[in-house]
A protein has these predicted regions:
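Active-site recognition of the HExxH zinc-binding catalytic motif
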Residues: 441-458
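Propeptide-to-catalytic entry region of secreted or membrane-anchored zinc metalloproteases
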Residues: 162-163, 172-182, 193-392, 399, ...
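Short pre-active-site segment immediately N-terminal to the catalytic Zn-binding motif
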Residues: 426-446
């Protein structure tokens, strides 16, 4: 007698069985109550395991190979159910898959068919490594030249670590911002369109999968975000009544909006670095574990996240004092238009209290900025960036803050909001903010411009550091709205129509410590650059960290139009010594300007800079010095500006360098908060003084028994010479005499084949210029 379960099997249709590898899709139009798709299998309990729900029978026809033993007395083994691994392979490979709506998902071992309408991501490869919180992603649907589709991209994480977000598709182009968590981020991009079949089915068929690995770059100094308020500030910002009713204008809202704008700076800058083949490097923020604000769902769900920290700092001034018309930068008659920067600098310095030599990079939002309609100007606002010493600072007002997005879901609506600017309540800044989306451009973009100054960027001929941020929206949306600024109706905007950082800004960022990423070689401690005129009109440029690029300025030019890069390309070698000639440099200039005075700014790989005000003069005979023995020597380029009142040139050719029996035994340094002078003492009790005797005196003795002599100097300088140290042939280096942390550091070491024979420079109340004299 057959076992009882075989009787049950005989009552069942063959159609209720499937082979283990069956992927038949012929029954997609029939009723399906079968095993859920892979997307369903990965939704339970936070694990990507198999659902424990029993599998109902399929009503479709399948292979009967497993039914061959039904009439035998020995029952065959039942087919095993296909398993799905915990880390499903389909999430670890890029590409598009069809959801095959109406059927359970196929086995992992089969080849999945591709949808021609699956999103094609153009700027991020699968398994890419990035170093920021928010990543800009763009791509196309099918071939935009053949079919212009409208629709929506939905981006979701496999692990549901962040809510799904929707992004519009315009004429088959899309731009997306992805919020990343540390580690692997397995993402699904689903495209839906009313013009395509299966658009409303629960299992999307036009999907692409992408894995992005994010590593927080903790080995670089962060960009600090600060909301600065007056001591009696209520913590509110300008906004129209309707928007206040909808989202309020509280300090909490200001923090959310400022944080999201900073994420946009980061995403934009990282993408610009990548497009310029400089890697996905970008600045980072200090973070804190706090209530999530990246998604509008975070508050309702009580989600906690590691978000960019926004420091709230109150300054010593009242709101009325901050809004004084004499402090307003937009007031042409203001008596103290730069004081808001000084007030912010003082408050930030007191808050962070940096240690000597510790740099802090701080971008400040002036919350109490206010549109004063009666005077037709913004008070309490300054757009400035720069700083020195321990604090590098950018400041900008909150006059456009109400137009900023608060969450990632609000980015496209914010840059598509055509609501006219109501100047009864908020400012039309520079008359370029006639609508809400244009106000967001000006506010977010101009603040990023000042942050560029914070990182050392000057104004440029194009890009963010000119004023190209008026089109910042184009980096985040594919369709631009009507512009009150240009009176244009807008339309599709692609990557080549976006604003950008200038190439020179990005080269500065590459060398900046705030842009360091994991895997970088250790930062070179000496970032200095030197220039040495030598024989035959050649100027030898040296930098121990390597020479990165040279900016060239013609007489009368404030902005750089011409530059030369070094060490670019996969097989290039970092050059630490480079010969420059005037004909070679001028050949790179416009033919009608080749006789103009040429100024150079030479940048090192480690971020140092050296200025040559007149290259032709440096390369000429004017840089030669005839020594007492008849030999010619050469003056290096000089540190310090030699612009103090009463500054006079000074020069010393060392007796020990031209008269062999004379032995240099000691060097005396005269110093206080700066260098006053240097005295060279010889064995025969004679001395040579460069500068003045003043302040304290410190001695440095040379070991004459071992033949020790001076090989170079290390100095700290800016406007004048802050401090000086000696380097010797035995590898010794003295202390820095003077202000050891003032200005920036420079190493004066003759190039190969040359030796130090003297010093020169200029002296006023103290030394305000210093260079060395070298000879073969």
């Amino acid at each position: 007698m057959a076992p009882s379960f075989l009787k049950d099997l005989k009552r069942r249709s063959k159609a209720s069985f499937r082979t283990e590898k069956s992927t038949d899709g012929s029954s997609s139009n029939e009723t399906n109550t079968s095993t859920p798709s892979t997307s369903t299998l990965n939704s339970g309990g936070g694990h990507e395991g198999i659902s424990t729900t029993p599998t109902p029978p399929l009503t479709s026809s399948n292979s009967a190979s497993n039914l061959q033993g039904l009439d035998n007395t020995v029952p065959p083994p039942l087919p095993s159910r296909p398993t799905v691994s915990i880390a499903s392979k389909r999430y670890s490979t890029a590409g598009s898959v069809s959801g095959m709506s109406g059927l359970g998902s196929p086995s992992q071992n089969c080849t999945l068919p591709s949808s021609p309408y699956a999103p094609r991501i153009l700027n991020v490869a699968d398994n890419a490594w990035v170093y920021q919180k928010v990543l800009s992603v763009y791509g196309t649907i099918a071939d935009p030249a053949l079919q212009a589709l409208e629709g929506c991209i939905t981006v979701k994480r496999v692990d549901d670590g962040f809510p799904a977000t929707d992004w519009p598709v315009c004429e088959s182009h899309f731009k997306v911002l992805v919020y990343l968590l540390p580690g692997p981020n397995k993402l699904i991009f689903n495209f839906t369109s009313p013009k395509l079949a299966n658009n409303n089915l629960g299992n999307p068929i036009h999907s692409s999968h992408l894995t992005i690995h994010m590593i927080p770059p903790l080995a670089s100094p962060p960009l600090q975000l600060v909301v600065l308020m007056g001591q009696d500030s209520p913590g509110t910002f300008d906004s129209v009544p309707a928007r206040i009713e909808r989202e309020d204008n509280s300090l909490e809202t200001a923090i959310k909006k400022f944080r999201m704008s900073a994420y946009l700076w980061q995403a934009f800058t990282a993408e610009q670095m990548y497009r310029n083949k400089l890697g996905r490097r970008v600045f980072r923020f200090e973070e804190e574990w706090t209530n999530g604000t990246a998604s509008y769902r975070d508050k309702g769900a009580g989600t906690m996240r590691s978000e960019a920290k926004v420091h709230v700092v109150r300054c010593s001034k009242t709101v009325a004092e901050l809004r004084d018309l004499d402090l307003a930068q937009q007031n042409p008659n203001a008596k103290h238009s730069g004081d808001l920067f000084s007030i912010a600098l003082q408050a930030v310095k007191g808050y962070f209290n940096p240690l000597p030599g510790q740099k802090q990079y701080v971008s400040v939002l002036l919350l109490d900025a206010h549109w004063d309609k009666s005077h037709n100007m913004i008070t309490g606002h300054a757009a400035l960036g720069g700083g020195s010493g321990e604090i590098q600072l950018a400041v900008f007002g909150s006059q456009a803050l109400s137009s900023y997005p608060s969450h990632i879901e609000e980015i496209v609506p914010a840059f598509s909001d055509c609501t006219p600017t109501d100047t009864d309540w908020v400012a039309n800044d520079c008359n370029e903010s006639g609508s809400s989306w244009e106000a967001a451009n000006i506010g977010i973009g101009a603040h990023m411009h000042e942050t560029g100054h914070l990182f050392g960027c000057p104004h440029q001929t194009s890009g963010i550091m000119l004023r190209d941020y008026v089109t910042l929206n184009r980096s985040f949306v594919t369709r631009e709205c009507y512009s009150t600024r240009t009176k244009s109706k807008g339309g599709l905007v692609l990557a080549d129509q976006e604003c950008s950082w200038h190439r020179l800004d990005l080269l500065r960022f590459r060398a900046h410590p705030a842009f360091a990423i994991p895997g970088d070689t250790p930062r070179h401690v000496d970032d200095s650059v030197q220039a040495w005129p030598v024989d035959n009109g050649i100027v030898m440029v040296t930098a121990s960290s390597g020479i990165a690029y040279i900016e060239m300025f013609l007489d009368g030019e404030e902005l750089c139009n011409h530059w030369q890069e070094f060490g670019e390309g996969p097989n290039s070698v970092i050059q630490r010594q480079k010969e420059l000639t005037e004909p070679e440099l001028r050949a790179r200039l416009p033919e009608d300007r080749r006789k103009a005075k040429l100024r150079l700014s030479i940048k090192s790989v480690a971020g140092g800079s050296h200025e040559i005000n007149d290259f032709g003069l440096l390369a000429s005979k004017a840089s030669r010095v005839k020594l007492p023995n008849g030999q010619f020597a050469f003056k290096s380029s000089k540190s310090g500006l030699s612009q103090m009142n009463g500054s006079k040139p000074d020069q010393v050719v060392l007796n020990s360098a031209v008269n062999q029996p004379t032995l240099l035994t000691q060097v005396k340094f005269y110093h206080g908060f700066a260098l006053d002078g240097v005295e060279f003492c010889y064995e025969d009790s004679t001395t040579q003084l460069f500068g003045k005797r003043g302040g304290s005196c410190s001695d440095f003795n040379l070991d004459t028994r071992k033949g020790e002599y001076i090989t170079g100097f290390y100095l700290r300088s800016g406007f004048w010479i802050d401090g000086l140290a000696i380097m010797t042939s035995l590898g010794r280096k003295s202390a820095v005499y003077g202000n050891a942390t003032g200005g920036s550091g420079h190493t004066l070491m003759p190039p190969r084949g040359y030796t130090l024979v003297g010093v020169y420079g200029s002296v006023a109340d103290w030394v305000d210029g210093f260079g060395i004299i070298i000879s073969r």
